[in-house]
């Protein structure tokens, strides 16, 4: 599998266009023509993480936080420059999945919510993208192979269902002329073929991969296919809100979250005996959504990087906050590894996928 193919799979499942405009996602360092020897997931790409990739003979790192984010003015043998140089010198590709993974329904916030054990979950702040209906015409005796090829690319899937197609039978006709090299039929002779009209749905970020799949796998030289924009929309968005299976006090919940997330410390605002049942969570830095979460009925808003004045404002307005530190997003390492194993199952014998064990938290706790 080449890096370019991996990028298509990632864009299919974690669309790059869903990242914030200020973000820097995608292939940041590398060559999309290289074959993959292994994948290492990490929260941050540090020198220790690069060394681990080298030891594992893994030439692809997928990080949540972009190594190249603010303007890089020089690449020298210290600071970020030394990491970038080491990546290039060792032919290691670096891919960033940042805010596009944050807003993904299966992304960082869902991983945190699952770790805490939230149920009946929904998104705090939703966006949407459009679906398209695809229709094309396939010779009847080729239809199953064609559907298999689409399924292998992750197309025609809806939630937990695969092979989501509609078929209708018909008869096609054509006459090969000139330099045609027909899969069926003879030159200068009208050919009638039993065909299947195949229809299925895709998301807007799957348009290009679907077009390529049809052109690469359809038996005809010039296949006919249509993309029809539908009213149906798919949702993605920032933050998760859900319920605990039992009510706790705020003090109990803070200890519970600390244990479930395996983090060294937490801090909270609010009365220690406040009842907590409904929980909203945004990993990383989610301040700015605490009041919307409260309006949605959340008893506590869980995030990281909470500043003094934001905490004071929330306390005055009786909005409970729980600060789980930015590094709590480390759960994405194992979470993304599991997602990649599902998305890349047909390549599972070609290369290994690892979740980095390197702790990249810059803080020490006492």
UniProtKB/Swiss-Prot annotation:
SUPFAM superfamilies according to UniProt: NIF3 (NGG1p interacting factor 3)-like (SSF102705)
Keyword Lipid metabolism appears in the UniProt entry: no
- Give the GO molecular function terms: metal ion binding
Q: Does the keyword Metal-binding apply?
A: yes
What GO cellular component entries does it have? cytoplasm
- Tell me its family: Belongs to the GTP cyclohydrolase I type 2/NIF3 family.
Q: Indicate the quaternary assembly.
A: Homohexamer.
Query: What is the protein's name according to its record?
Result: GTP cyclohydrolase 1 type 2 homolog
């Amino acid at each position: 599998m080449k890096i370019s193919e991996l990028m298509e799979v990632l864009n299919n499942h974690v669309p790059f266009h869903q990242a914030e405009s200020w973000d820097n996602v995608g292939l940041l360092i590398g060559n999309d023509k290289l074959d993959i020897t292994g994948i290492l997931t990490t929260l941050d790409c540090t020198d220790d993480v690069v060394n681990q990739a080298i030891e594992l003979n893994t030439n692809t790192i997928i990080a949540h936080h972009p190594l190249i984010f603010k303007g890089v003015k020089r690449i020298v043998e210290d600071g970020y420059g030394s990491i970038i140089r080491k990546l290039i010198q060792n032919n290691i590709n670096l891919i960033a999945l940042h805010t596009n993974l944050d807003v993904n329904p299966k992304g960082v916030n869902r991983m945190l919510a699952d770790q805490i054990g939230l149920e009946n979950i929904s998104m705090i702040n939703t966006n949407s993208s459009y679906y398209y209906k695809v229709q094309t015409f396939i010779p009847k005796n080729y239809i199953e192979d064609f559907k298999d090829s689409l399924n292998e690319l992750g197309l025609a899937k809806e939630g937990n269902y695969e092979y989501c197609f509609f078929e209708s039978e018909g008869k096609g006709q054509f006459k090969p002329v000139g330099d045609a090299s027909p899969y069926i039929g003879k030159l200068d002779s009208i050919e009638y073929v039993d065909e299947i009209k195949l229809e299925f749905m895709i998301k807007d970020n799957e348009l290009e991969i679907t077009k390529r799949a049809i052109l690469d796998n359809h038996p005809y030289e010039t296949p006919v296919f249509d993309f029809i924009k539908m009213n149906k929309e798919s949702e993605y968005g920032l933050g998760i809100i859900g319920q605990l299976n039992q009510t706790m006090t705020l003090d109990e919940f803070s200890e519970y979250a600390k244990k479930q997330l395996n983090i060294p410390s937490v801090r909270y605002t609010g009365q220690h005996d406040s009842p907590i049942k409904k929980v909203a969570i945004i990993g990383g830095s989610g301040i700015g959504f605490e009041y919307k979460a409260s309006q949605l009925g959340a008893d506590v808003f869980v995030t990281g990087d909470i500043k003094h004045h934001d905490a004071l404002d929330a306390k005055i307005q009786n909005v409970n906050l729980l600060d789980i530190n930015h590094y709590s997003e480390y759960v994405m390492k194992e979470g993304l590894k599991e997602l990649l194993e599902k998305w890349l199952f047909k390549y599972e014998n070609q290369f290994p996928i690892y979740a980095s064990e390197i702790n990249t938290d810059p803080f020490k706790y006492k």
